[in-house]
């Protein structure tokens, strides 16, 4: 009997010690990982920029923050969104695109003589001159070439364009529930000029630079820039 009681006490002591070790050593890392995953899934995450479509504002392989809670979209914000529901030429291949919001629902967008207009107001495109680039020049693989895009508006872009998604055909303004986006590196960016409008429901989040990034980069991915999206009238 005494031996049985002793064995039971030893077993209880072993399991008690094992539980304490679990709570002390194993549980904290599990909780930390759980908190990090919850934050990344629901609130904030980061992305690695792939390609040069947002150059010079964002560089290839640069890390950017993603705010998944911000659904109050503004002109000038940089966003990331799922490509396959918006770009019919992606053939279902899932990628995340990073572009800048140019037009909101109801906006008219046009390009004339090298200047971009939204609702007849000229857009501030100073971000094109970052890294010493001429504002009216586009950088491609280390060489400079003029922007040769013809003048256009949403109606002319969407009429008879086989690459446009179905909800983008024959539209004179940005449809409800969608956005018109462009990459800062206009000469190489695959964006709304080629596949049409982006559904808001496919947007992952609003992107911003990290605190240690270049000062101008941070400005052109911040609310300070969105508040100065249009060229100020003199």
Task: Annotate each predicted stretch with a short phrase.
Residues 45-60:
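Alpha-helical transmembrane signal-anchor/signal-peptide segments
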Residues 2-20, 27, 60-234:
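Soluble "head" domains of membrane/secretory-pathway proteins
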Residues 1-12, 37, 42, 51-52:
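N-terminal capping/interface segment
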Residues 24-42:
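Hydrophobic membrane-insertion alpha-helices, especially the h-region
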């Amino acid at each position: 009997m005494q031996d049985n009681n002793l064995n039971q006490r030893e077993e209880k002591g072993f399991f008690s010690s094992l539980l304490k070790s679990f709570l002390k050593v194993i549980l904290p890392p599990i909780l930390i990982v759980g908190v990090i995953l919850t934050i990344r899934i629901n609130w904030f995450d980061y992305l690695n920029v792939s390609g040069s479509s947002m150059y010079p504002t964002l560089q290839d392989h640069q890390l950017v923050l993603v705010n998944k809670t911000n659904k109050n979209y503004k002109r000038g914000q940089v966003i990331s969104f799922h490509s396959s529901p918006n770009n019919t030429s992606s053939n279902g291949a899932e990628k995340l695109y990073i572009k800048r919001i140019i037009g909101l629902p109801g906006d008219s967008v046009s390009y004339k003589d090298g200047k971009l207009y939204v609702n007849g107001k000229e857009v501030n495109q100073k971000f094109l001159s970052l890294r010493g680039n001429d504002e009216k020049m586009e950088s491609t693989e280390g060489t400079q070439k003029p922007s040769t895009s013809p003048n256009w508006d949403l109606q002319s872009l969407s009429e008879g364009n086989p690459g446009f998604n179905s909800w983008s055909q024959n539209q004179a303004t940005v449809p409800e529930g969608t956005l018109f986006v462009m990459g800062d590196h206009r000469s190489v960016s695959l964006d709304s000029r080629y596949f049409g409008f982006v559904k808001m429901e496919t947007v992952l989040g609003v992107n911003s630079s990290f605190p240690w990034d270049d000062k101008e980069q941070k400005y052109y991915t911040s609310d300070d820039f969105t508040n100065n999206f249009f060229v100020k009238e003199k």
